Amino acid sequence: MMHLLKKILRIVKIDSNVFAEIEKEKSSLFQGFIIVLLTAFSNALIARQYLFSGHSAYEVPVLILIFMWVFLNWYVLSHIINFLCCKIFSDGKKLNKKKSVLKLIGFSYSPELAKFVILFFPNFLQVISLGTFIWVITCQALATKIIFNYKSFLKSLGIVILSYILQILIVIIFVILIYNFF
């Protein structure tokens, strides 16, 4: 447990060496899952406290949707990043690193754990949310740079941003299809 906390602190400090260590460890996929679970829990608590307080009819379905969204986001974003890095921006290398990307993207959500502070300081909801989002993007770009041995941080940052754009488009298409189906 202490080992996981030390890794989380090093990720939060954006220590590039910890990403390489995590990529090599076999147990780090489960640890990445734990971080994503804690992130989902913090987001669900914030939504319950500040967005849906007083609307008990919506509480449970929304909390379930938040947990599902966080885990789908982790899984889909990891696969989009892996696809873009392996197929489109491969630099001639044909390495498929699905598991490594899943591990490190899970760990890159560590800054989101700072959202627990919002429970005590609700006036900083927007500032902390935006700050942790930028922090997570930075961690994901660094993880992408390390996994795929890119020389440029900007290239990996562009891939992460493109991955988010593609994920948003997938969600929009999915919502349109569901809306038209029902």
Regions found by a protein language model. Name each.
Residues A47-G54, I118-L119, V175-Y179:
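Juxtamembrane "helix-exit" motif on the non-cytosolic side of transmembrane helices
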Residues H55-Y58, V127, F181-F182:
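Membrane-helix interface and helix-disruption motif detector
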Residues N82-I170:
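Hydrophobic alpha-helical transmembrane segments and adjacent short intramembrane/lumenal linkers
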Residues I168-F182:
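Juxtamembrane boundary at the C-terminal end of a transmembrane helix
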Residues M1-K99:
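Selected alpha-helical membrane-embedding segments in polytopic membrane proteins
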